[in-house]
Regions:
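His/Asp/Glu-rich metal-coordinating catalytic cores
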Residues: 2-74, 79-220
Length: 220
């Protein structure tokens, strides 16, 4: 029997571009889908093309019109291109915010800068703990990146498992944050992954990136 539920992946920003990360996941029968949002970022304009513009944000009209179907916002890390618009856009979205502790501190400051209450921010422990949000179960997956407590997301529906990596670097010895846990990713792969949404700058280079640990000695 074919399921009447469908999985939706809609990048509102950040796909095929640098910055303005905002990814919408939906699940459910047509017209009655429930949604979660991964990241609410900004991008910075090119000064020669958009003078006088300070920030650029994604167009949220699609999910604004379905705001009562949005069950949660998950922030992967505290860089501006992933969190920078949270204080500006939250009034249009009006959904709980989930993230790790360091990211929550930054999110709280951005909300309060815009006179928004930060009471809806919930700090989550890392995977294998999972948060039930609507029809989704979401786990916070620690990954190495150039900021504390960067994370990917393990997103499960009753029918699929999605890995949304967030920004990551395969660094076994980062200066900041946790090292890349290849066993954790292998275990997830062995459980079965239906969709991998991978976000990594310079991913098409066939040369390994340098560990950030290599920078310590030159600047010490």
């Amino acid at each position: 029997m074919t399921s009447k539920n469908k999985l939706i992946y809609l990048p509102l920003g950040g796909a095929g571009e640098i910055g303005m990360n905002m990814y919408l996941y939906g699940y459910g029968p047509k017209g009655k889908e429930r949604f979660i949002l991964a990241d609410v970022g900004v991008t910075f304009p090119a000064m020669d093309g958009t003078p006088g513009v300070d920030l650029i944000m994604a167009d949220t009209k699609f999910i604004q019109d379905k705001a009562d179907q949005l069950d949660g916002i998950f922030i992967t890390h505290a860089h501006e291109d992933h969190i920078g618009a949270i204080g500006l856009l939250w009034p249009r979205l009006n959904a709980p915010i989930y993230c790790r502790k360091f990211t929550a501190v930054v999110a709280k400051a951005k909300m309060e800068d815009r006179n928004q209450s930060s009471d809806m921010i919930e700090i989550l422990p890392p995977y294998p703990e999972m948060k039930k949000v609507g029809p989704f179960k979401v786990g916070i997956l620690p990954v190495p990146h150039s900021i504390p407590e960067a994370s990917g997301l393990v997103i499960e529906t009753p029918e699929q498992r999605i890995i949304h990596t967030g920004d990551l670097k395969l660094d076994p010895n980062p200066v900041v944050g946790e090292p890349f846990n290849s066993k954790l990713f292998a275990d997830l792969g062995n459980k079965g992954v239906d969709v991998l949404v991978c976000d990594s700058t310079n991913i098409f280079s066939n040369k390994p990136g340098r560990s950030e640990a290599t920078l310590v000695k030159p600047i010490a």
